């Protein structure tokens, strides 16, 4: 049975909604796969079947989704279809993206070969869960490989470049910090869009934040570690300033940690508001020692 892994937005959360570069990678530790209430009867499977049915009704009410075999989906739901997933909800690691990718993959009647059109179609599907979507999460879950989405241009739109699994330095390790707070994405994204209506905020975001996203991506994939951690610290501080509403108050000091003094650095993971925070380090032992004396649990990604 095919698995649809979770995803991590390493760089580009929020900014990619408006066409910035983004770097995404699979989160292999969590995944979803098709199952059946009949084969695995449980309250969770019944709830999954009911949730997919609600999504199915949304898809049926929009002609955009005619390229999906919705008749078959409806019949299989009647027969007990469910999606067995251990991807945590409200944690920014692709719970809805994996389901969208799985439905598209299983029920598509035609292929969508152009990346931008595929992304837009998946975004329209995922809007059901978040109110708005860039389409990047389900695209990542669908491809199942790390990739960079280029900055949008007038001429070429956005191009997708698949990366090798060793796209970053072997000395950099990634971990997730569990804030123990579940958070819905839609209100956070809507508030961000409202903030962008202020011209001074928009200017700082587009002219300082977005270029830093690109610098983080380039320095990481060029394996220039010192440059990377320097740009990452600048980005984290700007997230603290420009995306304060997405960072739980009790975790804000983490965004000021410096690799040189603390041994690790922290940024948002997905929409924020809780869920996981994303950490980067070159010293796993020192990082483990730091977090074992706190109330937070960490999960190693790489």
State the predicted function of each range.
Residues 3-9, 15-17, 24-26, 33-61, ...:
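C-terminal nucleotide
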Residues 98-110:
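Stable alpha-helical structural segments in soluble proteins, enriched in small hydrophobic residues
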